[in-house]
């Protein structure tokens, strides 16, 4: 089984939705942790941290979803650059979805 563009787009969108839901669930826990280490303002304003966290989560969720649908490791590895391009080209929309939580 190999990736087709439509399958990859659907999996990417599912991975994005899963990531947004997970981010909403753990947001309060993250904020509590940041307050405990007394670097709340520094970490909240560190956009790179959040973007890296979100991109890493989308990629991880994509891999999990693809494995659940029995795609091979080779197929997944070949698709990841396209997933990264999808994420980068849609980062504004992704950040807006996260910010609206």
Describe the predicted segments one by one:
Residues 71-101:
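Amphipathic alpha-helical binding modules
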Residues 39-48, 69-78:
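Short, surface-exposed loop/turn segments at secondary-structure junctions
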Residues 1, 5-8, 43, 47, ...:
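Generic alpha-helical structural element
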Residues 21-32, 67-71, 96, 100:
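Intrinsically disordered or highly flexible coil/loop and linker segments, enriched in small
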Residues 1-36:
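Short terminal alpha-helical segments
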Residues 47-69:
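Acidic, low-complexity, intrinsically disordered interaction modules
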């Amino acid at each position: 089984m190999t990736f087709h563009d439509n399958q990859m787009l659907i999996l990417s969108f599912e991975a994005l939705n899963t990531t947004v839901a997970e981010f909403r669930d753990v947001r309060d826990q993250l904020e509590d942790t940041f307050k405990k280490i007394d670097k709340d303002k520094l970490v909240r304003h560190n956009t790179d941290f959040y973007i890296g966290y979100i991109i890493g989560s989308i990629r991880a969720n994509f891999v999990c979803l693809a494995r659940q649908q029995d795609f091979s490791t080779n197929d997944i590895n070949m698709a990841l650059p396209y997933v990264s391009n999808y994420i980068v080209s849609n980062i504004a929309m992704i950040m807006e979805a996260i910010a609206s939580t």
